[in-house]
Amino acid sequence: MTTILENLPAGQKVGIAFSGGLDTSAALHWMRIKGAVPYAYTANLGQPDEDDYDAIPKRAIQYGAEGARLIDCRAQLVAEGIAALQCGAFHISTAGVTYFNTTPIGRAVTGTMLVAAMKEDGVNIWGDGSTYKGNDIERFYRYGLLVNPDLKIYKPWLDQQFIDELGGRAEMSEFMRQAGFEYKMSAEKAYSTDSNLLGATHEAKDLESLESGIKIVNPIMGVAFWRDDVKIDKEAVTVRFEEGRPVALNGVEYKDAVELLLEANRIGGRHGLGMSDQIENRIIEAKSRGIYEAPGLALLYIAYERLVTGIHNEDTIEQYRENGRRLGRLLYQGRWFDPQAIMLRETAQRWVARAVTGEVTVELRRGNDYSILATRSPNLTYQPERLSMEKVQSTFSPRDRIGQLTMRNLDITDTRDKLRIYSEVGLLTPGESSALPKLKEDESGN
């Protein structure tokens, strides 16, 4: 049975998801001097705040890693991000502004690809920097075990000895300095940031207070659109989809989806598009707050949704949205590769996305302020001549509509009878200022 190790497994190989930051650097060196055999695995997720990926494995070796590998996860990350977009797998929103589940998508890719690399090296113990209060500890647990059923989990941040010796950033910085690495602790920010090519998450510290707003955040994928001194010119951009896949921006075709998303990030980022402030429910049902960036996905999603609504009928769109919200929750919970998620993904990608071919032109302004300027698709079922108020060849006549309205008498009569019954049993009372009935107040006045 898979176990979570509470103490360092001395003498054994331990894989650590290594970012090169202070926490994982100190943890790796600490594990080495305590007798474990650490292996470092770094995921290249196209993080916008990382300048030199090649240097990270080299630092891991300096800190005591027996081996260090850089795993390029960008293509898989973008593939999963586009799959989520095709399915509308986004369940968190506030007043219509969407969080694009960029961190959960990143965890699905990291959790599977890094553990697969560890398995190749005969490393069956995995550690990472997730804490016991967050979502990632469960996401990584699930994805890791899917790839390697023999996996055991060791997290330094769940090891009391590690916590006692290196429980804070100041202690970690001093530990590294005394070890001769001259590791300088970076300036403390008012919040923490986690990012990948799809988007960035800002949370914790000052952002835990709902009295602190988006204005304390320094965007890393776009501009602070709320600042008066930030000049932003409006810009028209055209996005083209073929069978549900984004293939071109402003007439430029991209064979590499990673390059397309990078350009979409640049375009959307110039306007601060895709930033949102969300209160959400973590997997353990406690509420948390995050401020998110996803300029490229936001741009693609605007165009994709426009085409979906112009191509598919109402019932299909309703099912797409309901399934998307459900799939978004599964993704958030670390269940992106579970059977129920695969079933929902297959439905949307096959029967919704494959019909989405066309292009949409959007005018971007500041933040999430935009207008759709044009929509073109050979698959549109929107045909204005069907409902034109002008004198045109119509698909139905006035007499046809009279017949259709007459048929409505059946359900109108049924509704009237039901309202009478509700009134007779005391559920409804006639409104004093309206011909419509209203709910009868209970004894408490509600």
UniProtKB/Swiss-Prot annotation:
Residues that coordinate or bind L-aspartate: T131, N135, D136
Domain of life per record: Bacteria
One GO cellular component, as annotated: cytoplasm
TM region(s), chain numbering: none
Name under which the protein is recorded: Argininosuccinate synthase
Disulfide bond annotation, renumbered to this chain: none
Main location: cytoplasm
Similarity comment: Belongs to the argininosuccinate synthase family. Type 2 subfamily.
Main enzyme class: ligase
Intracellular or extracellular location(s): Cytoplasm
Biological process per Gene Ontology, one example term: argininosuccinate metabolic process
Keywords: Amino-acid biosynthesis, Arginine biosynthesis, ATP-binding, Cytoplasm, Ligase, Nucleotide-binding
Organism: Burkholderia thailandensis (strain ATCC 700388 / DSM 13276 / CCUG 48851 / CIP 106301 / E264)
Binding site for L-citrulline: Y99, N135, R139, S192, T201, E203, E280
Binding, ATP: A17, F18, S19, G20, G21, L22, D23, T24, S25, A43, G129, T131, D136, D194
Gene3D superfamilies for this protein: 1.10.287.400, Argininosuccinate synthetase, chain A, domain 2, HUPs
Record's subunit section: Homotetramer.
GO MF annotations, alphabetized: argininosuccinate synthase activity; ATP binding; protein homodimerization activity
CDD domains found in the cross-reference section: ASS
Reactions accelerated catalytically: L-citrulline + L-aspartate + ATP = 2-(N(omega)-L-arginino)succinate + AMP + diphosphate + H(+)
InterPro entries for this protein: Arg_succ_synth_type2_subfam, Arginosuc_syn_C, Arginosuc_syn_N, Arginosuc_synth, Arginosuc_synth_CS, Arginosuc_synth_type_1_subfam, AS_cat/multimer_dom_body, AS_multimer_C_tail
Record pathway: Amino-acid biosynthesis; L-arginine biosynthesis; L-arginine from L-ornithine and carbamoyl phosphate: step 2/3
Record EC number: 6.3.4.5
